[in-house]
Amino acid sequence: IEMNKNMKILDGLYGDRDDFGIASFTIDPENDTPTTLKKYSELIEVKSKNWHFLTGDKKDIYDLSNKGFNIFSSINEAVEGGFEHQGFFALIDKDGYIRSRVNDYGTPIVYYSGITNENEDVQGIEMIKEDIDKLLNLK
């Protein structure tokens, strides 16, 4: 849920642009049907036509997460909800490439923390906003 709250911040900043979009992939496709996801988007008051809540075959979703984006997600009956994930955002450019940056030591930062909130370090959200601005030539 924190991820979607933070994604709403990004949607509020960029959601009216034709050159920006958000894809949220469920990792619980057995419960998150297209109808359920539509109701959820209404519940959290998504206004942008460019924010898509996506579901599909469980194996395909987990393969996309783990192998395509290289972002961990897994079924885990021992945790609340029965699944776990890293809570990262990936920034994909218009050509389909995952964008990244380097830290002060030259180490690549490929993903952005999406589970931060106002009571924690918001560095991941601030970094993705900066990088979106660069991609959209806003700064």
Predicted features and spans:
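Sec/Tat-exported extracytoplasmic proteins
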Residues: D11-G15, I44, S65-S73, I132-K139
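Alpha-helix boundary/interfacial micro-motifs
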Residues: D11, L43-E45, S74, Y105, ...
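Short, charged low-complexity intrinsically disordered segments located at boundaries
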Residues: T35-K38, K67-S74, L91-I98
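Structural micro-motif
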Residues: K49-W51, Y62, F69-S74, F83-A90
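Structural microenvironment flanking redox-active thiols in thiol-disulfide oxidoreductases
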Residues: E2-L64
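Solvent-exposed, non-transmembrane alpha-helical starts
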Residues: I1-E2, G81
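Generic preference for well-ordered secondary structure
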Residues: G21-S24, E45-K49, N76, E80, ...
